[in-house]
Design a protein with these regions (language model features):
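N-terminal periplasmic/intermembrane-space "pro-region" immediately following the signal or transit peptide
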Residues: 32-190, 196-204, 631
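Short loop/turn motifs that connect adjacent beta-strands in outer-membrane beta-barrel proteins
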Residues: 66, 89-94, 113-128, 201-205, ...
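Sequence/structural signature of outer-membrane beta-barrel proteins
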Residues: 178-183, 217-219, 253-254, 278, ...
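Extracellular loop and loop/strand-boundary signature of outer-membrane beta-barrel proteins
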Residues: 182-184, 253-257, 294-299, 345-359, ...
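Carboxylate/His-rich catalytic cores and anion/metal-binding grooves
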Residues: 198-245, 263, 378-380
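Signature for the C-terminal beta-barrel architecture of outer-membrane proteins
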Residues: 287-288, 308-517, 530-537, 542, ...
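Outer-membrane beta-barrel "beta-signal"
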Residues: 373, 515, 611-631
Length: 631
């Protein structure tokens, strides 16, 4: 029996918890030297102790953990921004550190706390959000710059139970996904569970962060051999391995049967150091590049986090003269390895000597690097540029400084052996995004858009070839201040603007890097897919700053040029988030989905296509512990 996920129950599930405990213990007992402020002569011990909490640390010298991108903090801050209370928010670059969030709120505390609710119904909403965020940051207020001082904290302990009926989709590279933006977690029809914890330790400029969980999902039939072969043809990959005469185990095509999953893994696990307002980090870590709530064209949490090295300017930078034009700006650089890309040699050109043929059908496990810069020329406008390159991998040139620089500085499509050989500079994508609080309705409406293009420098340069995710957000409804509305559209279908389909072989795809923009089989960009259109909408009633009732809809439709017969997916979902006290959260979600694809299940389009109905019921319990350990 073929299994895409190895079934085991022994020591694996306990690895994240053991590592978290060991890491927090290690950094707790390790002495870290930091600058100790001078104490005037004659000062008593009690006075020294009372002064400790008043010491203001230099922010550029203190490490601070990132806030996970699936935290409630982000939609809360996005709403506070759209209510026109915070200005220095970089919507297109997430995650933020806890210290960065604290700095965003420092300038508005007096304004919010002293605001008069008379005549402005949104003031009460802003005050609720501010109070919830201040409670979230309560542990950070006592951080000190003293010898052997630090902070170790269990951030959250949680369990997620998910029941699915029907046949769910888990194929963002082709037919679509029932559950999106979920770190590539496994799920199948039946009972699924994810239970874990997160925690961090800080010491001076250094941070250790770990988020691990135990995952369990049922076995499944998944795709038939005929459907898997048809999708392999769509991708331009080889279905059968000539050396073994068995199908390639392609992570992007979930061919069944698939065994039960019982495993432990890290969602995030990284170490970082603070250097002059930069967080330099290594490990598995979150990223979300784009202002949208439902997806990020360049990067999201739709797939498992990659192992990467990152340099992130976490605080805005002001450059004399330049910032008069661009305003303050932030930037980020990331490089890491992708997994789940299977090596396929090209039997027609095994030696790679024919410049007219690629030397491989698909390289194995390439690397990716990306660069992003975002500007805020005014308090109401943000815009950013991003570039991604996927290069190297088994069968191509090794990952070296030389091959990295070649991919970094290559902007034109190479011809002949430059593309087909080992020295291919890689698959290159460019992104652009912006957000703008509209004039005359600054605290009501925020317009934003995310976009990405393949084989062009920027979507601005080639809008007709670009993919787009525009959105608009109404921060509160007139007469109902607790209600907000958000709508986002999404398309990766270039034929809508230039009349020419790319048959699914353009966005998130590349002629050489055929498994393209994926990690462990799932797109790490926007869940909308390779040649699809659709969108999302949400209407949310806020009970408090971190509690709400929400109804949403989602649509996704692949073109018939991409998937034979096309696909259609529609769902309606409801969410309730409620706190018991301030530190125990119940998050429940119900989704009702219809999807159909004529190519399913045989691989041969059949009409009329059978409609699949899927219901997903999820409940999550999360405890945010009160206590921390200081050292």
């Amino acid at each position: 029996m073929r299994r895409n996920m190895k079934e085991h129950v022994a020591i694996g599930p306990f690895i994240p918890y053991a590592t978290l405990l060991a890491g927090l213990t290690l950094i707790t007992v390790a002495p870290i030297t930091a600058q100790q402020p001078a104490t005037p002569k004659g000062t008593g011990q009690s006075e020294r102790d009372s002064n400790r909490s008043a010491i203001v640390c230099e922010p550029s010298l203190l490490g601070s953990p990132y806030i996970p991108v699936d935290s409630w903090v982000y939609p809360a801050v996005l709403r506070l921004y759209s209510l026109a209370y915070v200005d220095q928010v970089y919507l297109g670059m997430r995650p933020w550190t806890r210290a960065s969030l604290r700095h965003m709120l420092e300038d508005i505390d007096a304004e919010i706390e002293d605001a008069n609710t008379y005549g402005d119904s949104s003031v009460g909403e802003a005050q609720d959000i501010y109070a919830a965020l201040i409670h979230f940051l309560r542990y950070d207020a006592g951080m000190k710059c003293l010898t052997n001082q630090g902070n170790s904290h269990v951030e959250s302990v949680y369990t997620v139970s998910r029941g699915i009926s029907g046949t769910p989709l888990r194929d963002s590279f082709h037919l679509g996904s029932t559950v999106i933006n979920n770190y590539g977690r496994p799920y199948e029809s039946g009972f699924n569970n994810y239970s874990g914890m997160s925690g961090y330790a800080t010491a001076g400029r250094f941070v250790l962060y770990v988020r691990g969980e135990f995952e369990a999902a049922p076995s499944a039939t998944r795709y038939s051999q005929g459907l898997a072969q048809a999708l392999s043809t769509v991708d331009g990959t080889t279905f059968l391995n000539a050396a073994t005469n068995f199908p390639y185990n392609q992570a992007t095509i979930p061919m069944g049967p698939i065994g039960t999953t019982t495993d432990g893994r890290f969602l995030e696990a990284f170490v970082s150091g603070r250097v002059i307002n930069h967080e330099i980090s290594f490990g598995q870590q979150d990223d979300w590049l784009g202002p949208g709530l439902g997806g990020g064209m360049a990067y999201s949490n739709n797939a498992e986090n990659i192992y990467s090295f990152r340099i992130n300017r976490v605080e805005p930078l002001q450059v004399p003269l330049l910032s008069r034009l661009t305003g303050p700006f932030r930037y980020e650089f990331l490089i890491g390895s992708l997994r789940g890309h299977i090596f396929m040699p090209n039997p027609a050109n095994p030696s790679g000597t024919n410049p007219n043929l690629p030397n491989v059908i698909n390289p194995g496990d390439p690397w990716v690097h990306l660069e992003k810069i975002s500007f805020r020329p005014t308090k109401n406008l943000e815009f950013g540029f991003e570039r991604t390159a996927i290069w190297g991998g088994k069968g191509h040139g090794p990952i070296t400084i030389h091959t990295f620089l070649k991919s970094f500085f290559s902007f034109a499509s190479p011809g002949g052996n430059g593309k087909n050989g080992r020295d291919d500079p890689g698959a290159r994508f460019g992104a652009f995004d912006f957000s703008y609080r509209l004039p005359f309705v600054r605290n009501w409406l925020t317009l934003y858009s995310d976009s990405e293009v393949h084989d062009d420098v920027s979507p601005i340069d080639a809008p007709e070839r670009a993919s787009w995710r525009p959105g608009i957000y109404l921060s509160h409804v007139p007469g109902i201040p607790k209600l907000d509305i958000r709508v986002e559209a999404a398309t990766t279908d270039p034929s809508r603007s230039n009349g020419a389909s790319q048959y699914g072989r353009f966005m998130y795809y590349e002629a050489i890097q055929k498994q393209g923009y994926t990690n462990q089989g799932q797109l790490f960009g926007d869940w909308i897919g390779r040649e699809d259109k659709g969108g999302q909408a949400w209407i949310t009633y806020h009970l408090s700053g971190n509690e709400w009732l929400e109804a949403g809809v989602r649509n996704q439709k692949a073109t018939t040029f991409f998937i034979p017969g096309g696909t259609t997916l529609n769902d309606i979902n409801f969410q309730v988030v409620k706190r018991i006290g301030k530190d125990f959260e119940i998050n429940s979600n119900f989704a009702y989905e219809h999807w159909k694809a004529p190519i399913y299940p045989t691989g041969i389009p059949t009409y009329p296509a059978g409609q699949q109905t899927v219901t997903t019921t999820t409940i999550q319990f999360t405890w945010f512990p009160e206590r921390k350990i200081s050292f």
